[in-house]
Amino acid sequence: MQVLVNKIWYEGHPLRWLLLPFSVLFALITAIRRSLFRLGLKSQTPLPVPVIVVGNITVGGSGKTPTVIYLIELLRQQGFNPGVISRGYGADIQGVKVVTAADSAASVGDEPAMIVARTGVPMVVGAKRVDTAKALLAQFAVDVIICDDGLQHYALGRDIELVVIDGKRGLGNRHLLPAGPLREGAWRLNQVDFVVVNGGPAQANQYEMQLSPSAVLPVNPKAVAVFDPTQPVVAMAGIGHPARFFETLTQQGFQLALSHGFDDHQAYDKEVLCELAASRPLMMTEKDAVKCRDFAQENWWYLAVDAKLSPQFDQQLLSRVRSVAAAKQGKSHGV
């Protein structure tokens, strides 16, 4: 199914024309929803600290999670205490839940498990972003909130909107769902504060981001094996665009005996992956690794990657955060 969807969205498959009437309906529904917030018929909840929303206008992976991790580290370096909120996609969460390093990806979601495993940041997940933000502020001394994937969740007040675009696939056929991959029209890019292009050329007023491989690490934290870079590996990826990961491995000099793409947010079975690897080293993404660490074999590995953005982006982002923080502090003191 995903193969057909990709052909419709990114390769000009003629089935898109049959889906266009549904895209028109989707556009109407989303326009009405935005109007309800704009007219004040639905309320947006402001928060006492700067809120950065990291999202996209397309369905599927674009590099949001590495961007969130980059922002966490950038803000910490400048003396801020950031916290993160997320939906926890794929997990059955009742109300809100604080994410800990001991939580499984199944219980909190792939991305939250990865973010907390990598950074140890205070993080709360739940279906309603406003509730997660309030819980985060109530339980942790955070002074900036990063919302992982909440661009279309308009009930959450936000001060900075950052959109991440897949530099290889762009906006596809530029149609709204279901004929195309867009959650909102391309016009939305003109309204956000920052547009980050992952792995492709940036246009004027956009920022280029590269994902730089940093280390090959064992999926099983107790493993004592040493990775042999001369041995062919079986590559797997359950992300929005698996081909991007396989290309990265090839560019880094890995020999791929086999590559297999799974659906995004795929739940994995130990026996299936053991059969796939067939005693060869199994190489996966960091997001896949958090779902496999409890049953990982000695020769299962993941490639950690770090987002790289320009000093100009850092300067502009930090300037905006400081400005918003000062304004909110002044308002809280009646200035």
Swiss-Prot record:
CDD domains: SIMIBI. GO terms for cellular component: plasma membrane. It holds the Pfam family LpxK. Pathway: Glycolipid biosynthesis; lipid IV(A) biosynthesis; lipid IV(A) from (3R)-3-hydroxytetradecanoyl-[acyl-carrier-protein] and UDP-N-acetyl-alpha-D-glucosamine: step 6/6. Its EC number is 2.7.1.130. The keyword Lipid biosynthesis applies. HAMAP family: LpxK. This is Tetraacyldisaccharide 4'-kinase.
